[in-house]
Every structure is written in C-alpha cells, then in structure tokens.
Amino acid sequence: MGASGSKKRSRPLQGLQERLLRARAGTCGECYNALEGESLRSQEGSDREQNSLSCEGQRYQQGDFMNTPWRAPAAEGKKNAYRQQNMDDIDSDDDDLVGVPATPRVPLRTMTYKLAVDMSHFIKEKGGLEGLFYSERRHRILDIYLEKEEGIIADWQNYTSGPGVRYPMFFGWLWKLVPVDTSQEGEDTETDTETHCLLHPAQTSRHDDMHGETLVWKFDSMLALKYEAFTRYPEEFGHKSGLPEDEWKAKLKARGIPFS
C-alpha cells in the first residue's frame, strides 16, 4: 500500500473513526434511506459502473493457506437480511453514517487474507479501532463502511465466542477483542461527552456479550502468522474444523454455544 493510496483513504477512514465514536446505545431508523437518496444524487453519470457491479477482485482460493476453513460468501437471502437489520438499527435522529454512500463506490468483492491484512494495518495507522469499546452497533458500522467504501461484502467479521479474548475467525483480520474492567473508569475512558450523549459503549458493551464482558478492539500483528481462532477453538468452525461431528458438538455444548 503506497503513499498515494494512503492519502486517498485517509479522509474516509477518519470519517469511519468519527462514526464509531458517535455510535451510541439504542436503535436507529430512517437515516439509511436518507443516505440512499444522497448517494443517488452523487452517482449521476456513473450508473453504468454501478449497474455492472461484480465480484471481481482478489478471492481466497482453497489451499492457499493450510488449515484455513474459510466461510463461503453469504447467500443472497442472508445478505439481504443482514442489510435489513442494518437499516432497522439506524434511527432518524442518528447521523453516525451520514456521508457514507448507500451503494458501494467500487465493485463488490469478498474479503481475502491479503485484503484483511492490508485493511488491518491501514486502520491501525490511522488510529481507527485501537482501544475502542466494542458493541454490536459499532460492529455493523464497520461492516457497512467497508462494504460501501471498499466494496467488501459484509460476511466476514466474526470472532470466537469467549469468555476471554475473542479472536477473529477470518484469517488475516488483525483486530481481536480483549475484555477490560470498566468498574473504575466508567465514562471517563472516552472523554467526549458531547459525542456520547446517551449510554456510553463502556456500559452497554457487556449487554451485547453473552458472557457480560466489556470488550475493546486491540491490534495484534501476530494474527497474520498464526490462526489463533482455529488453533484454540476449532469446534467453532463446525464441519470445517476437521473434527468428528460428535466431538465438536460436544465441545460447543460444554461451552454453552448454540449450534445447528
């Protein structure tokens, strides 16, 4: 990733950080539709490009990395349901995603190992996630942002179930989730009180977590070399784990993780 690429992406990523910081508790609604209207105005003259969206770009090929049971891209129905959930979670008085195009700026593509590593380092360079409290809302904002700005289909961001450190299940994504104790810090951890006008993510994060832990994003460059999620918790990959079905199901049951 050269200097010119960094300059082009610098401002959009700064916008991502601002939106993540503005994300707060509660639901959201009609802003997504407003974004769509804004995007339609901005894409005049480029309809041909948008109508020919493809899944070109780098794809992971099975066998490129050993013991990497990648998830297949989400089925169209699942992707539509996911996007509907995103729309349901955007409130008319919430501007967290204002300025994000409603349609991707570039052709759609699936996440790849190289792309995940590159995006992880770029986000770290711009200070986008380090130490930021995790929440389901911020998770969705990151998904939507990377899909609209980078064309990355939002079916890749998953973490191990915990408790404890949550490792990314997509090999190449270098951001893990680390539990922190917020009993003493409360809202002082992120000091912009105007930005956080409702419940602070430090207080709501644990409600998103099945173990009641408060999590923050933390960069770990070693995740590019070692597939921690698969090494530590192969049962979470189900049939792709290589384990006998009875064994991985028993392990999931013992940890209280639902499976189908």
From Swiss-Prot:
<feature type="short sequence motif" description="PxxP">
    <location>
        <begin position="104"/>
        <end position="107"/>
    </location>
</feature>
<keyword id="KW-1032">Host cell membrane</keyword>
<keyword id="KW-1043">Host membrane</keyword>
<comment type="subunit">
    <text>Homodimer. Interacts with host CD247/TCRZ; this interaction induces down-regulation of cell surface TCR/CD3 complexes.</text>
</comment>
<feature type="lipid moiety-binding region" description="N-myristoyl glycine; by host">
    <location>
        <position position="2"/>
    </location>
</feature>
<keyword id="KW-0449">Lipoprotein</keyword>
<dbReference type="GO" id="GO:0020002">
    <property type="term" value="C:host cell plasma membrane"/>
</dbReference>
<feature type="region of interest" description="Disordered">
    <location>
        <begin position="39"/>
        <end position="59"/>
    </location>
</feature>
<keyword id="KW-0472">Membrane</keyword>
<keyword id="KW-0899">Viral immunoevasion</keyword>
<dbReference type="InterPro" id="IPR027481">
    <property type="entry name" value="HIV-1_Nef_core_sf"/>
</dbReference>
<keyword id="KW-0945">Host-virus interaction</keyword>
<comment type="function">
    <text>Factor of infectivity and pathogenicity, required for optimal virus replication. Alters numerous pathways of T-lymphocyte function and down-regulates immunity surface molecules in order to evade host defense and increase viral infectivity. Alters the functionality of other immunity cells, like dendritic cells, monocytes/macrophages and NK cells. One of the earliest and most abundantly expressed viral proteins.</text>
</comment>
<feature type="region of interest" description="Mediates dimerization">
    <location>
        <begin position="140"/>
        <end position="156"/>
    </location>
</feature>
<keyword id="KW-0519">Myristate</keyword>
<feature type="region of interest" description="Acidic">
    <location>
        <begin position="88"/>
        <end position="96"/>
    </location>
</feature>
<dbReference type="InterPro" id="IPR001558">
    <property type="entry name" value="HIV_Nef"/>
</dbReference>
<dbReference type="GO" id="GO:0005525">
    <property type="term" value="F:GTP binding"/>
</dbReference>
<keyword id="KW-0843">Virulence</keyword>
<dbReference type="Pfam" id="PF00469">
    <property type="entry name" value="F-protein"/>
</dbReference>
<comment type="similarity">
    <text>Belongs to the lentivirus primate group Nef protein family.</text>
</comment>
<comment type="function">
    <text>In infected CD4(+) T-lymphocytes, down-regulates cell surface expression of CD4, CD28, CD3, and MHC-I or MHC-II molecules.</text>
</comment>
<dbReference type="GO" id="GO:0016020">
    <property type="term" value="C:membrane"/>
</dbReference>
<keyword id="KW-0014">AIDS</keyword>
<protein>
    <recommendedName>
        <fullName>Protein Nef</fullName>
    </recommendedName>
</protein>
<feature type="compositionally biased region" description="Basic and acidic residues">
    <location>
        <begin position="39"/>
        <end position="50"/>
    </location>
</feature>
